[in-house]
């Protein structure tokens, strides 16, 4: 993977970088039609038109690619035919042609190449792109697209460059221990499936967007500080000039404490499966 740098021909180009897609992607053609569905823009609104997620809206129109997170096509080999861009995620995707004629998209893992064969099986070989139950994967292996519930589909480590490491297995064989990229160590049922390898496009976090307009293309709207708003818009607002917030601690637009408050529900059933909390940034 390579980062492409631009000359400072304009203010927006200064320090701007992009991913060199030509080094990885194999096609500029349209995606597989049978695996594409239309996607309507929600702009962070619910069915009543109220904002439920701030700073979203606009952006380029996209079509959704149906990704096989479940990898439930068992014991049937497939061949990677293309590596493609997906506007809905920061990872790339691969089109897999199975021997029975079916086609599916899976996440692109570091080291995948066109022509490679992949399979999801109980006793699949431990090589990049194959999917197997956690109980049959050796300790120390880097994984992605890990299930939290058997058969539900991968939920952990799906974004660009992410992976989890299998640290160990319980004596009774029911759970395995994983270390997440956040530093959290947790247990997962050994029957859950995971895919071998790290998600590709690992240099995505190094991209310098260069100008606000590129974020608008992605559907990200500006984030305005509360201290520059009016008092009817935010608890930090109001005052003459650059006034302090006038409170002991920063708060959200709805008056709740904003910093240092743990937001995870301690009564969650999965709380007992967390061996070590995630490390602070």
From Swiss-Prot:
Tell me the Gene Ontology biological-process terms attached to this UniProt entry: cytoplasmic translation
Describe the function of this protein: One of the primary rRNA binding proteins. Required for association of the 30S and 50S subunits to form the 70S ribosome, for tRNA binding and peptide bond formation. It has been suggested to have peptidyltransferase activity; this is somewhat controversial. Makes several contacts with the 16S rRNA in the 70S ribosome.
Record GO terms (molecular function): rRNA binding; structural constituent of ribosome; transferase activity
- Sequence segments annotated as region (Disordered): 223-255
| Stored SUPFAM superfamilies | Nucleic acid-binding proteins (SSF50249), Translation proteins SH3-like domain (SSF50104)
Q: Which gene encodes it?
A: rplB
Give the originating organism: Mycoplasma capricolum subsp. capricolum (strain California kid / ATCC 27343 / NCTC 10154)
Q: What is this protein called?
A: Large ribosomal subunit protein uL2
| InterPro entries named in the record | NA-bd_OB-fold, Rib_uL2_dom2, Ribosomal_uL2, Ribosomal_uL2_bac/org-type, Ribosomal_uL2_C, Ribosomal_uL2_CS, Ribosomal_uL2_dom3, Ribosomal_uL2_RNA-bd_dom
Cellular component, GO, one term? large ribosomal subunit
Give a yes or no for keyword Acyltransferase in this entry. no
The Swiss-Prot or TrEMBL record describes its family as follows: Belongs to the universal ribosomal protein uL2 family.
Concerning NCBIfam families, the annotation shows: rplB_bact (TIGR01171)
Its keywords, alphabetically, are:
Ribonucleoprotein, Ribosomal protein, RNA-binding, rRNA-binding
Q: Which sequence ranges form a coiled-coil region, renumbered to this chain?
A: none
PROSITE patterns, sorted: RIBOSOMAL_L2 (PS00467)
